[in-house]
Amino acid sequence: MVPSMSNVGSRLDVDLSTPDNIGTTIPLVVANMTAVAGRRMAETVSRRGGLVVLPQDIPLDVIESVVDFVKTRHPIYETPITLAPTDTVGEALSLIHKRAHGVVIVTDNDQRPLGIFTEADAGGYDRFTQLHNVMSTELLCIQEGADLEEIFHALSNQRLTAAPVTNKEGRLIGCVTRRGALRS
């Protein structure tokens, strides 16, 4: 990005809305503030085509790990939160708000989805209950490369907010939401 002359008379005349007509705008650059620009923000904004300026007071090795992390993320599917069936409701609840999709994918040792856990699934259970006792095992697994419009309709028809995405071997590679399918 190089500053140059443009025909835009005012910053108020700039339209950053996406071409998909869902009413969101794309941030071009995220500020280099410690509370704003981090690993998760960099991943999300990069997936949408924006830039993140990491704070200058972060050690170089941390910046390198953030950049490596972002470069290894899937360009369409969101990074899922994964836990084992023997992990607890408390562990899931402490992680579930780390991602906008609001789900934890319960996987086996080979990263194959076994179930899905939402905050609503925790109702009536104590925090030490293991996930295999409360997770939903009726999964809609999306195959990598599936048509995004079909994904949206499948999620809508089954009234799901998110679903795991698997590769040909059935291993988890991401998570997709209705909103994510629309935006991609």
Q: Where do the language-model regions lie?
A:
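Terminal-region recognition feature
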Residues: 6-8, 41
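Bateman/CBS regulatory modules and CBS-like beta-alpha motifs in cytosolic regions of diverse proteins
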Residues: 9-33, 62-101, 106-109, 113-116, ...
